[in-house]
Amino acid sequence: MAGHSKWANIKRQKAVVDAKKGSVFTQLSRAIIIAAKNGIPDPTGNFQLRTAIDKAKAAGIPNDNIERAIAKGAGTLGSDSNSLEEIRYEGYGPGGVAILVEALTDNRNRTAADLRVAFSKNGGNLGETGCVSWMFSQKGVCIVTGVENEENLLEASLVGDAESYEMIDQQVAEVFTQVSDLEKLSQTLKAKDFKLTEVEIRWIPQNEVEVTHIDQAKSLLKLIDTLEGLDDVQSVTANFDMAENIIKAFSI
């Protein structure tokens, strides 16, 4: 997971810039709608909704917008939120890099067409369901900041049924667990006074394709940026790592 986390750190820097875009507000609002639709519209009893709300607040989405999204998901605003569905698309990027795209859409034909164009114009191709998902494992991830003592983090992580952790930056760690144990892990870490900046479910590549050429990196990152810019796309995950010199070239 080391290389993936290295790139994930750059992605988080990029997210600070992307968070200023209206499309990110739309994505986070849709995540709240789906979470409220799939469970009860009360964050205290709906972990998926609670984490979606936390992400929205971290991005600066006003409380009124959050409450409206919850109401849409609960069906109390008479909206068409019931037409939204979660779909995972799969494909390949330049150099055979495997790519997973998670979308929320009210028109799967439109979304598939948009994705197909994005892939084909940027050196990739949209594949069939299952063509690359076997290369990834879904994990729960807690991002912890202000880690001053790794032994304390390890102890708390074990109590919370974590599988592993990794220091990805100075005093910043990612703690991994089974998806079913994510709520327990996050609650345990908080109870031990660790600061969690994000709690999420993430696709983790089992193996990675090393990107060592700048031209391939440019094509791949252009494809990912294009995919992430589509209105229906919630997240994009790929099984690549980059050489340090290339990462520095694209750092913000």
Question: Where are the language model's segments positioned?
Answer:
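Positively charged, low-complexity, intrinsically disordered RNA-binding extensions
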Residues: 143-252
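N-terminal cationic and glycine-rich segments that engage phosphates or anionic surfaces
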Residues: 1-127, 132-141, 252
